[in-house]
Structure formats: structure tokens, C-alpha cells
Design a protein with these regions (language model features):
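Extracellular loop-to-transmembrane helix junctions
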Residues: 38-64, 144, 390-394
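Membrane-interface "cap" regions at the ends of multi-pass membrane proteins
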Residues: 1-32, 61-66, 70-83, 87-94, ...
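Transmembrane helix-boundary motif of multi-pass solute transporters/channels
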Residues: 13-53, 238, 249-252, 256-259, ...
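Inter-helical loop and helix-membrane interface segments of multi-pass membrane transporters/permeases
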Residues: 5-8, 36-41, 76-95, 108-165, ...
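A generic transmembrane alpha-helix motif of multi-pass inner-membrane proteins
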Residues: 379-400, 421-457
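Helix-loop-helix connectors at the membrane interface of multi-pass transporters/channels
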Residues: 2-4, 78, 111-140, 240-244, ...
Length: 457
């Protein structure tokens, strides 16, 4: 193991880890998914529940996964395997490793959609995006959706080929500051539109009347995306972290950064929707279509909407790229560690998997629309399988590994290697042993029961 540790790639320091891990978190999950869920499930009350959960459940899982990666210098399969070869441990490692392999193909399809929208705004055809039927016609076109998906995929793989420092870290150091600046600019523009203050109030001020059990379940599910929990990413990135870098300080920074960007995304989109529709309930309930159908209509109704459209979809593209890089890196690392493959060979295999599975999702609304998985289109199925089933199971596996196999004390020792005290140790200990596995089980049971029609969510 010592030889492997010496040869393993590493981030240059805290900044490299923070920006790369934040890049993994600040993706479509925050820019695309968080705002439409906040709009749909109560605005301010959803935000409050999310922040409380992120500061407890989310924080605990980030620390646990990062520490696990650093103490073993392994990606998920090797990290679990370092503590035994029993079937349960192998299962826990592989489910954490397989998740990013299944997510990044359909994630890249959505990234391709973003490329299409950005290119339309840049070419001066942004007004076409606001027309009824544009989005459905595009995703059902087959060839256009496939080409955009392939462009996004090739760009991601090119960065992965370059390695951890020259690829992942370098791109994150450039894209993340730009993403922050664009977020502030667009949010500032959005909240100053006529009627937008009602949207700000809806998003930031909790209203208990909007609270429901679904608010909690949805906020818990969103955390997996917003903080990159249970995807194998944080274990992998933790394995690249140097021993003199503070885990607690680094993970707190990632947590705060990701949450701040999620809030900024809400301020970009929800006030703009209120300005456009006056807070029409149907518009707020638009769900996943909010960014690709409603937002172009909002921009079309604005002065300088063309410029805002370019900036907005450029921001979304940056966010999508940083997350797809992290997902792909986690997958590539698994093959490097477990099969002893070169980075080039592992990246080539992941590229083939991305093209094969991603093409199913890209063509799933067009030529393959008649083929479904359990009544769902391919993209919807892969999203349900990973987010609602596999991630909760992976989170439970992490909790059991830390609390029942490794021992919480070992994780505490890893966290304090930099010589600083573990300030939130009591919260971590209680959450990892009791509440985190319970929360993950609630998400799993609720999601599966809803899919089977036993409950309505």
C-alpha cells in the first residue's frame, strides 16, 4: 500500500481539493435541480429544511467520505476492501463506485442540452427557445440531441485524460471563480426586475403553510446531488488529499460554497419566474422543465434577455462540466485502482460506457421513445435508479462501515491529523451512527413506495 500511496496522484493543497470538490457539488444538481424543487416544494420552508439537513446530515457524510478516502488512499471499492473482503464490504464499495458510472452518461445528455441552448443564444436565435414546443422538438429530434451529447462527452473526457492536477484541478481553479462571478451578476439582475421581490420573499422567507412531508424527503434527496454525497466522488477526491490539509476546514468550505451557489441559483431563477408570471402556481410547479422551457420565456420578456441568456447558460455549462469531470474522475479512478489500468485505458473504457448509456438517454425521447424501463424513459429511469435507490443504499453502507467496522474513533484520528481539534465531533458521532442511516432509509423507502404506487408524493 505504501508504494501505491507514493505513486497516487494528489491535489496541490487545500485550494485544489476545495475547488475540485466544490466543482463536483456545484453542478446541474444546484443550478438546475435545486431551484425547481425549491419552487415546487414551498420556497423558503424548503430552503430552511435543506440548510438544517446540509449542516447535519450533509456535513457528516462529507467528512466521513473524505476521511475514508484519505486514510485508505483508495477509490470506493478499495476503500471498503481495505477493511475486509466480506461480501457486504465489497457490495458497499462497488455500489458507491457504480453510481457515478451510471450518472455521468445521462448527466452528459443534459449537458448537451445546455450546449444547444447556449449556442442558440450566441448565434442570435435565443427568441426561438421561448417558443412553445422548442424543447420537446429538440429532445425528440434524435440526431441533434445525440450530437450535443457527444460534444459534451468528448470535452469531459479530454480533461480527464490530462490527469488530476493538469486536468481536474486546473479546470476547476478557472471555472469555479468564473461561475461565482456569473452567479452574482445574473442573480443581481434577476432580483431587480419588476415584481421580482415577491419571488425573493417566496424563496427566502419560510412559510409554514407550505410545509409538507414531501418538503423533507425532497430536501434530503436533493442533498445527495448538491453535496455529491454517496457518489464515490468524495472518497476518490479524499484519496488525493494530502495529510497536512485539514479535512474539517476543507469540507466545511465545500459545504458552504455548494449551499451558497444553490441559494444563488434560486435567486437567479425564482425571482425571474415571479417577475414573468406573478408567481403563477402552474409555472412554479413546472419541475425539471423550469430551466429549459420557462426560463427562456422569462429572458425573452426582459430587456437584455439575449445577453442574460448567454451568461446564464454559460454558467450552467461551467457547472455541468465541473460536475461531469468529478463523476468521470471517480469512475476512472476505480478502474485504475482495482484493475491496475493506466489512466488512458480507464478513461477510454468509461468513454465507451458514457456513449453507450448516454445515447440511450439522448435518443430516449426520440427514436427510442417507445422503449421504456419500468414505464420510464431511459434518462428518467437512470435518474430514479441512482438518486432514489442506489445513493441512499450507498449512504447507509458508508454509515455502517464507519460506525460498525472502522470505528468512529479512527475517523476522528484521521480528521485531526493536521493537529487541529475536531470541533463538530459530537454532531458527527451522533449523526453517522444514528440519524444518517435513518434519513437515508427514509429516502429509499419513500421513493420506492412512490414508484410502486403505494404512496403519492
Amino acid at each position: 500500500m505504501d508504494t501505491q500511496k507514493q505513486k497516487r496522484s494528489a491535489f496541490s493543497g487545500k485550494i485544489g481539493f476545495v475547488l475540485s470538490a466544490a466543482g463536483a457539488s456545484v453542478g446541474l444538481g444546484n443550478i438546475w435541480r435545486f431551484p425547481y424543487l425549491a419552487a415546487k416544494y414551498g420556497g423558503g420552508i424548503f430552503l430552511l429544511v435543506y440548510i438544517v439537513l446540509a449542516a447535519t446530515f450533509g456535513y457528516t457524510m462529507i467528512v466521513a467520505e473524505t476521511a475514508l478516502g484519505r486514510m485508505t488512499h483508495k477509490s470506493p471499492v478499495g476503500a471498503f476492501g481495505a477493511f475486509g473482503k466480506k461480501g457486504g464490504l465489497r457490495f458497499g464499495g462497488w455500489i458507491n463506485a457504480v453510481i457515478p458510472i451510471l450518472i455521468v452518461p445521462y448527466y452528459s445528455v443534459i449537458g448537451g442540452w445546455v450546449i444547444r441552448y447556449l449556442s442558440e443564444y450566441i448565434s442570435g436565435h435565443g427568441s426561438e427557445l421561448s417558443q412553445d414546443g422548442y424543447f420537446s422538438n429538440f429532445i425528440s429530434s434524435g440526431l441533434s440531441a445525440e450530437v450535443c451529447f457527444l460534444i459534451f462527452t468528448v470535452f469531459t473526457l479530454a480533461i480527464i485524460f490530462a490527469g488530476v492536477r493538469n486536468g481536474v484541478e486546473r479546470v476547476s481553479k478557472v471555472m469555479m471563480p468564473v461561475l461565482v462571478v456569473l452567479s452574482v451578476v445574473i442573480a443581481g439582475y434577476s432580483v431587480t426586475r419588476p415584481g421580482a421581490l415577491e419571488g425573493v420573499k417566496y424563496f427566502l422567507v419560510p412559510n409554514v403553510a407550505n410545509f409538507s412531508w414531501m418538503t423533507v424527503v425532497t430536501a434530503m434527496g436533493q442533498m445527495f446531488y448538491s453535496l455529491s454525497i454517496a457518489m464515490g466522488i468524495l472518497v476518490t477526491f479524499g484519496s488525493y488529499m494530502k495529510k497536512d490539509v485539514s479535512i474539517e476546514e476543507s469540507t466545511e468550505t465545500v459545504e458552504l460554497f455548494a449551499t451558497a451557489i444553490a441559494i444563488m441559483a434560486g435567486l437567479m431563477i425564482i425571482p425571474a419566474v415571479f417577475s414573468f408570471s406573478g408567481g403563477d402556481p402552474d409555472t412554479l410547479q413546472a419541475g425539471p422543465a423550469l430551466m429549459f422551457i420557462t426560463i427562456p420565456k422569462v429572458f425573452e420578456s426582459m430587456g437584455f434577455g439575449h445577453v442574460v441568456g448567454i451568461l446564464f447558460f454559460l454558467l450552467v455549462l461551467f457547472a455541468a462540466v465541473t460536475s461531469s469531470i468529478a463523476l468521470t474522475e471517480s469512475a476512472v479512478s476505480t478502474f485504475e485502482d482495482e484493475l491496475g489500468w493506466s489512466r488512458e485505458r480507464a478513461t477510454a473504457l468509461i468513454g465507451l460506457i458514457m456513449v453507450a448509456l448516454g445515447s440511450l438517454s439522448a435518443l430516449g425521447y426520440g427514436p427510442l421513445a417507445g422503449v421504456t424501463m419500468f414505464g420510464m424513459q431511459f434518462l428518467d429511469f437512470f435518474d430514479f435508479l441512482t438518486n432514489s435507490v442506489m445513493m441512499p443504499i450507498a449512504a447507509i453502507a458508508i454509515c455502517l462501515l464507519v460506525s460498525r467496522v472502522i470505528g468512529v474513533q479512527k475517523i476522528e484520528e484521521e480528521v485531526t491529523l493536521d493537529g487541529k481539534p475536531f470541533r463538530r465531533k459530537k454532531i458527527f458521532n451522533f449523526m453517522i451512527q444514528y440519524l444518517c442511516p435513518i434519513f437515508a432509509a427514509i429516502i429509499l423507502i419513500s421513493s420506492v413506495a412512490n414508484a410502486l404506487g403505494w404512496i403519492a408524493m
